[in-house]
């Protein structure tokens, strides 16, 4: 290409981008995203990529629970807009990873999956049914007869057996489906404590998930466990839910020498890391608070970023390590039809990934970022560039310029860019002050679209509109993205079955 043509392309894009970004921060990149030269620069970077075929000394799997591709896109725009940009051109840290692909998430018995079956696929290398934890597809859900003889060995168990250090970090209860699939085996994801076991299950010797974590006997044990769900580990006399009078936290401390237990953000920041080999942190009775609420209400719980940073500080004392990280409350916010909290959780998830990237040797650590399944949130409506992602749609006129007024649907009412195919937002998206995003409407009204004229779609408690009335919004069955960097990351490209991710991680670490 001639110099004059390059100058022409460059000048045209700078002029266009300057007009679009009139209300944004000044450009720091001489080749703005979307320009000819930016794409050419990207091509050169791709041509220069070298495949890393070294054995991984560390493996980190980041799982954004329910982090659909639409969630990633909306969070990217939201983060960019919070930074003063138009938003669409922004990149989350993991979107800069050199390799990416798509993961097919179905369970062996469901077109649209649940977290138990999908995480089992990533942790064991085999797909299974919905609702079961690291047992094979021959097991029957909630059947006590399936408690024994159907176990699938997990990557974490294999790593511990081969002398690796291991850690689990989550913003949900540590006994919830996704983290549980790393260490437990159960035909029922809801058997989190002995209280949840049926009489028949107890007779058959079925073990609750919390007790399986404490009794974990592979290698020298899991070094780092951080999350919520304290009630599953304590007897009723200690404000827990256990009916067998076991105090699992005390059992864990007695079992592991050089161990520390923490239950608040302050304690996590101040425990003696030099004298600690094993760390257990249970920061709430159930799930941790949403990140937005934690910050707004100054709650004494750690952020996901802080937990990941602490976990890596401990695990990197060892020659090789495996760390599993879940941002679990993205999923919960979507179930509640509350896009604001889903996006805030995703942004914190991205911050945790960025911090991990700063702490590790990226040439020796395989890092994989993905989701277990999708959700029904969509991005639609022809909004103009830079339109608030949580706001009502304002489109362009026939000349391509932004309109002064909001776009209206066929019923002459404004509509939001983000909406759900189903969920609690069907009858009245505006929170009435009596419902929190975790409290679903018990009986959504089957009524027509309500008036949106006085809605504030950017309010934290706003429930985006939903087409079909559900008490809780459902998962979706579309593929989710996989992002990877480090040793053997180039194997995670194209369209893959979800259980393939396990095989790449196992190969990368020679496990």
Please provide the spans of the model-predicted regions.
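Bacterial N-terminal signal peptides that target proteins for export
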Residues: 2-14
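C-terminal motif of bacterial Sec signal peptides marking the signal peptidase cleavage site
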Residues: 21-22
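Short acidic, glycine-rich surface-loop motifs adjacent to enzyme active sites
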Residues: 27-35, 134-142, 318-336
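N-terminal module-boundary/linker segments of secreted carbohydrate-active enzymes
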Residues: 27-71, 77
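Long, structured ligand/cofactor-binding scaffold of large enzymes
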Residues: 48, 61, 104, 109, ...
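A post-motif C-terminal structural segment
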Residues: 52-57, 67-73, 77-120, 176-511
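Structural beta-sheet core signal
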Residues: 61-62, 168, 369
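Extracytoplasmic mature domains of secreted/periplasmic and thylakoid-lumen proteins
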Residues: 126-211, 221
């Amino acid at each position: 290409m001639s110099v004059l043509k390059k100058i022409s392309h460059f000048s045209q894009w700078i002029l266009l981008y300057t007009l679009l970004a009139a209300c944004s921060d000044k450009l720091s990149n001489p080749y703005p995203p979307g320009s000819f030269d930016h794409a050419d620069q990207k091509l050169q970077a791709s041509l220069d990529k070298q495949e890393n075929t070294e054995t991984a000394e560390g493996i980190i799997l980041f799982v954004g629970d329910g982090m659909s591709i639409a969630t990633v896109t909306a969070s990217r725009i939201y983060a960019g807009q919070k930074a003063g940009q138009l938003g669409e051109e922004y990149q989350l840290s993991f979107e800069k990873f050199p390799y990416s692909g798509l993961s097919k998430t179905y369970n062996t018995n469901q077109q649209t999956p649940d977290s138990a079956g999908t995480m089992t696929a990533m942790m064991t290398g085999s797909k299974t049914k919905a609702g079961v934890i690291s047992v094979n597809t021959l097991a029957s859900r909630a059947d006590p007869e399936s408690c024994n003889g159907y176990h699938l060995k997990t990557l974490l168990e294999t790593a511990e057996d081969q002398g690796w250090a291991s850690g689990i970090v989550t913003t949900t209860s540590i006994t919830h489906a996704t983290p549980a699939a790393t260490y437990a085996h159960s035909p029922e994801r809801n058997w989190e404590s002995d209280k949840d076991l049926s009489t028949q299950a107890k007779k058959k010797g079925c073990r609750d998930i919390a007790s399986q974590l404490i009794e974990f006997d592979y290698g020298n044990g899991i070094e780092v466990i951080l999350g919520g769900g304290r009630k599953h580990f304590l007897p009723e006399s200690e404000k827990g839910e256990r009916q067998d009078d076991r105090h699992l936290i005390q059992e864990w401390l007695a079992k592991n020498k050089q161990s520390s237990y923490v239950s608040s953000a302050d304690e996590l920041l101040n425990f003696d890391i030099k004298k600690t080999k094993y760390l257990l942190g249970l920061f709430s009775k159930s799930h941790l608070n949403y990140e937005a609420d934690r910050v707004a209400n100054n709650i004494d719980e750690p952020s996901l970023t802080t937990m990941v940073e602490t976990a890596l500080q401990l695990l990197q004392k060892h020659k090789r390590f495996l760390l599993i990280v879940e941002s679990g409350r993205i999923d919960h916010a979507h179930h509640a039809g509350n896009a604001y909290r889903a996006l805030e959780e995703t942004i914190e998830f991205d911050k945790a990934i960025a911090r991990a990237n700063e702490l590790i040797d990226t040439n020796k650590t395989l890092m994989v970022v993905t989701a277990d399944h999708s959700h029904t949130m969509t991005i639609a409506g022809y909004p103009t560039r830079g339109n608030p992602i949580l706001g009502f749609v304002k489109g362009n006129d026939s000349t391509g310029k932004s309109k002064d007024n909001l776009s209206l649907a066929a019923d002459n009412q404004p509509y939001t860019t983000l909406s759900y195919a189903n969920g609690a937002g069907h009858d009245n998206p505006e929170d009435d002050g009596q419902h929190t995003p975790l409290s679903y409407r018990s009986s959504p009204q089957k009524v027509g679209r309500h008036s949106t004229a006085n809605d504030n779609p950017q309010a934290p408690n706003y429930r985006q509109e939903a087409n079909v009335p559900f008490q809780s919004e459902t998962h979706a069955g579309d593929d989710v993205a996989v992002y990877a960097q480090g040793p053997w990351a180039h194997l995670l490209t194209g369209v893959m079955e979800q259980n393939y991710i396990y095989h790449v991680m196992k190969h990368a670490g020679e496990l």
